[in-house]
């Protein structure tokens, strides 16, 4: 399958009859951008992406060596994909290699989405091109929906979480503004209200994050729960934690040679956003410009957008939803 020749623009009229029948029976709504969404297994999807989810659940053949990068949208997905790729492929692609794949491809190409690319473009895609030793995929599906497609596999799942307020603001910039001319599709206030209702792509946020949090507590060898804020604060400790989980620990020689810092620098948002492929390139699967995947990547940027009243409202929602879970941001 050629990433550069496949389009993700599946229209509603191209849905299978099975998908149409199911969708007609599901709760439906419109998100803040006016897009129709339907609720499946507690999560909101556009109809085409739901078809990708259904195809994945039905036809994916997992391998125990698979690695899946999971996240709610706009929680540091691009960063985590780059780090994971650099870690598990470092024997083949040293971080100092002038021809490292991260220098010529966007991380979303190197870790393709199961439901938004592979199984959206094909009911049963050919996955033979992926490395048999450790195939690398990604998803925005909640844990219980993903697990249905994994069929009991013990593959590794790495989940990146983020403070809800920074997630919301990043979500608004990505989905609700046309990046080329800053045309507002939906105001931050409208996006905020829909977010609080949970009616947003792959939402509700709190159900999504809790599904992986609980999964990491139940089976820590299967699910690693990471936090964007901790990655920013202590990148060396967190990347070593990630390497240990993935079974590719840094050797003493690698640490002494500075490899950990090399990978951190290679995968930094500063470096990735400066690359020509990410300044002028596009994802051929969607047509979206690569530069839209990089904004600030900061902690606390929400303070520039949310009022004290909005802050208080969403904090109260999160406090209620995460109550007694042990999860805090």
UniProtKB/Swiss-Prot annotation:
Its main location: cytoplasm. GO terms for molecular function: sulfotransferase activity. InterPro entries: P-loop_NTPase, Sulfotransferase_dom. One of its GO terms (cellular component) is cytoplasm. Coiled coil: none annotated. Signal peptide: none annotated. 3'-phosphoadenylyl sulfate binds at residues 74-79, 162, 170, 295-297. Keywords: Cytoplasm, Transferase. It is found in: Cytoplasm. Belongs to the sulfotransferase 1 family. PANTHER family: SULFOTRANSFERASE SULT. Sulfotransferase that utilizes 3'-phospho-5'-adenylyl sulfate (PAPS) as sulfonate donor. This is Cytosolic sulfotransferase 6. It comes from Arabidopsis thaliana (Mouse-ear cress). The gene is SOT6.
């Amino acid at each position: 399958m050629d990433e550069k020749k496949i389009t993700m623009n599946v229209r509603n009229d191209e849905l299978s009859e099975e998908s149409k029948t199911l969708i007609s029976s599901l709760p439906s709504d419109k998100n803040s951008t006016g897009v129709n969404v339907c609720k499946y297994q507690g999560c909101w999807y556009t109809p085409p992406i739901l078809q990708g989810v259904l195809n994945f659940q039905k036809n994916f053949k997992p391998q125990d060596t698979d690695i899946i990068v999971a996240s709610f949208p706009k929680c540091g997905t691009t960063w985590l994909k780059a780090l994971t790729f650099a870690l598990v492929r470092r024997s083949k692609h040293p971080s100092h290699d002038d021809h490292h794949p991260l220098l010529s491809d966007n991380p979303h190409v190197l870790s393709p989405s199961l439901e938004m690319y592979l199984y959206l473009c094909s009911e049963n895609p050919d996955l033979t091109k992926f490395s048999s030793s450790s195939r690398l995929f990604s998803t925005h599906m909640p844990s219980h929906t993903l697990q249905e497609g994994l069929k009991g596999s013990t593959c590794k799942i790495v989940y990146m979480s983020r403070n809800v307020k920074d997630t919301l603001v990043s979500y608004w910039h990505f989905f609700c503004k046309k990046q080329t001319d800053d045309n507002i599709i939906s105001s931050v206030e409208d996006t905020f209200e829909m977010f609080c209702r949970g009616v947003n792509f792959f939402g509700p946020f709190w159900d999504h994050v809790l599904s992986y949090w609980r999964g990491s507590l139940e089976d820590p060898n299967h699910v690693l729960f990471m936090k964007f804020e901790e990655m920013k604060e202590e990148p060396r400790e967190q990347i070593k934690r990630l390497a240990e989980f993935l079974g590719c620990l840094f050797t003493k020689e690698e640490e002494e040679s500075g490899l950990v810092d090399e990978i951190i620098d290679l995968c930094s948002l500063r470096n990735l956003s400066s690359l020509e492929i990410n300044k002028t390139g596009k994802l051929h699967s969607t047509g979206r410009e690569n530069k839209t995947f990089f904004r600030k990547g900061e902690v606390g940027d929400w303070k520039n957008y949310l009022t004290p009243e909005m802050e208080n409202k969403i904090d109260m929602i999160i406090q209620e939803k995460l109550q007694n879970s042990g999860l805090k941001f």
